């Protein structure tokens, strides 16, 4: 028996690429611009995809488009499918010389990152490094969703799908405007921290919980320099790696205070999915990380 299938009813790879772009960009116009398609084509393909799956994938509103519950479920599969397609290409096209795009995420305060990136670029100039900043929890999620090839995060972590590589360990310092600091000040002075998902914030909150202290106020930021400059102006106090505040401390604009050893250090690890295809560019990147980790240990 021969089944006649209409060509326009078959889900194509480009439909998944369009769907992913609209989901990421939040609008048809932005997705069309990113993919270099006309808007009407993007709209038609999304509508066709919804008809084929017999479910709405997006909510339409004046500000753009957001995923429905079914759309969010669809996005997980689309990320995986497109990642598998990329890996399929890599298996056959990957040459001995590292090349292509390497999408790397990182928390803001990896002191060894510039050295690692510089060394890697000098050794492998044919690799296009794409760097994305974020918080530990969101970077883990993006690695798991195949949106990033790997990421530098605050660790260590335990996850069955993730493997990790040691990068560095740093001291955490409490940073204040005043030279003297008493632990009771946590109840009278605002805490300046990154959003939830930051490793330093987790350490600070654990310390305060163990001490039975309730901070007066928590003010959230997403830029390190804004936090440090706000501390220098007397807005509040924060906890960050020593290397991140060295320049302001040396200039006398802020003062650093050691905290109990139990909470006083943070490790940076590089993570990737265990089941991701190991390209030559990633293998070389891990080798560069390992070399600099050994240098730091000497």
Swiss-Prot record:
SUPFAM superfamilies registered for this protein in UniProt: Periplasmic binding protein-like II, Winged helix' DNA-binding domain
DNA-binding region, residue range(s): 28-47
GO molecular function, one term: transcription cis-regulatory region binding
Gene3D superfamilies recorded: 3.40.190.290, Winged helix-like DNA-binding domain superfamily/Winged helix DNA-binding domain
Keyword flag Transcription: yes
InterPro entries: LysR_subst-bd (IPR005119), Tscrpt_reg_HTH_LysR (IPR000847), WH-like_DNA-bd_sf (IPR036388), WH_DNA-bd_sf (IPR036390)
Sequence similarity: Belongs to the LysR transcriptional regulatory family.
Protein name (record): HTH-type transcriptional regulator CzcR
């Amino acid at each position: 028996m021969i089944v006649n299938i209409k060509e326009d009813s078959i889900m194509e790879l480009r439909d998944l690429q369009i769907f992913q772009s609209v989901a990421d960009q939040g609008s048809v116009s932005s997705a069309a611009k990113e993919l270099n398609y006309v808007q009407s084509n993007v709209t038609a393909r999304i509508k066709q995809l919804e008809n084929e799956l017999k479910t709405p994938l997006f909510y339409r509103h004046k500000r753009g488009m957001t995923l429905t519950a079914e759309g969010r479920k669809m996005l997980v599969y689309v990320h995986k499918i497109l990642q598998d397609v990329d890996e399929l290409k890599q298996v056959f096209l990957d040459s001995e010389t590292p090349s292509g795009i390497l999408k790397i995420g990182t928390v803001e305060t990896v002191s060894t990152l510039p050295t690692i990136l510089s060394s890697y670029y000098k050794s492998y100039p044919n690799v296009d490094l794409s760097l994305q900043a974020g918080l530990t929890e969101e970077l883990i999620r993006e690695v798991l969703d195949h949106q990033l090839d790997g990421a530098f995060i605050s660790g260590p972590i335990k996850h069955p799908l993730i493997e990790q590589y040691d990068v560095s360990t740093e001291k955490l310092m409490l940073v204040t405007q005043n030279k003297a600091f008493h632990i009771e000040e946590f109840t009278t002075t605002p805490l300046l921290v990154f959003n939830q998902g930051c490793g330093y914030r987790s350490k600070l909150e654990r310390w305060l919980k163990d001490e039975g202290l309730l901070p007066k106020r928590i003010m959230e930021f997403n830029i390190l320099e804004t936090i440090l400059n706000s501390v220098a102006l007397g807005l509040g106090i924060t906890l960050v790696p020593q290397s991140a505040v060295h320049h302001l401390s040396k200039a006398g604009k802020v003062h650093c205070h050691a905290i109990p050893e139990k909470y006083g250090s943070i490790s940076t690890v590089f993570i990737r999915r265990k089941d991701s295809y190991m390209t030559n560019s990633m293998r070389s990147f891990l080798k560069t990380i390992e070399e600099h980790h050994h240098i730091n240990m000497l």
